[in-house]
Swiss-Prot record:
Family: Belongs to the ribose 5-phosphate isomerase family.
Annotated organism of origin: Synechococcus sp. (strain WH7803)
Documented EC number(s): 5.3.1.6
Binding partners and assembly: Homodimer.
Enzyme active site: E109
Stated role: Catalyzes the reversible conversion of ribose-5-phosphate to ribulose 5-phosphate.
Pfam families the UniProt entry points to: Rib_5-P_isom_A (PF06026)
Catalytic reactions on record: aldehydo-D-ribose 5-phosphate = D-ribulose 5-phosphate
Pathway: Carbohydrate degradation; pentose phosphate pathway; D-ribose 5-phosphate from D-ribulose 5-phosphate (non-oxidative stage): step 1/1
Protein name: Ribose-5-phosphate isomerase A
Binding residues for substrate: S30, G31, S32, T33, D87, G88, A89, D90, K100, G101, G102, G103, K127
Name of the gene this protein is made from: rpiA
MF (Gene Ontology): ribose-5-phosphate isomerase activity
Amino acid sequence: MSDLQNQMKQAVADAAVQQFRDGMVVGLGSGSTAALMIKGLGERLAAGQLSDIVGVTTSFQGEVLAAELGIPLRSLNAVDRIDLAIDGADEVDPAFQLIKGGGACHVQEKLVAARADRFIVVVDSTKLVERLNLGFLLPVEVLPGAWVQISQQLKAMGGDAELRMATRKAGPVVTDQGNLVLDVRFEGGIADPASLEKEINNIPGVLENGLFVNLADEVLVGQIDGGVASARSLEKAG
């Protein structure tokens, strides 16, 4: 990752932290940009700049980080509502449709985003695309005993699926739910995210896929302008 990209991530994470208010129940996302945001939230709480915040995390990694920083946490089942969720994305199209799941946390991420009154996505400018899936593969979480069958069904739908393998251990990536992840590429990208999200989730054995359709209320983008990193709110197409 380049130094410029790191600067963009930090700028947008700093902007995200400014969205939190006293007394909020907040969804804390996963990934590198979200981790910077969680650190910023912890710093503001420690400095007394925020109070009465309760966090709901979307991954084990985020839970550990938030706990280390002293952020009070509750499970999704223990809260009636989430005031604001902030998370990253792997790709964002002009209509604010997303691909998420590079960290294999998209099931919990989607649960938190759907529960939130407001969902803000934070990305650097490299994550903005005209069409989803031309660059980043679509993650699909599947039951371990059905991944071959599901791969075949995805192929019949025009998708080329491969089982995600772990890099620090032998064998496949295993999600927090104990499932496997198929990474899928559709020729020409994904023209209709809303239809495809439903079609994939209707395959028996699929728990959830990484298409986030009509969930994002705002997208904050980190950018470099004149050598200086800053964040801006993206204008939604249409």
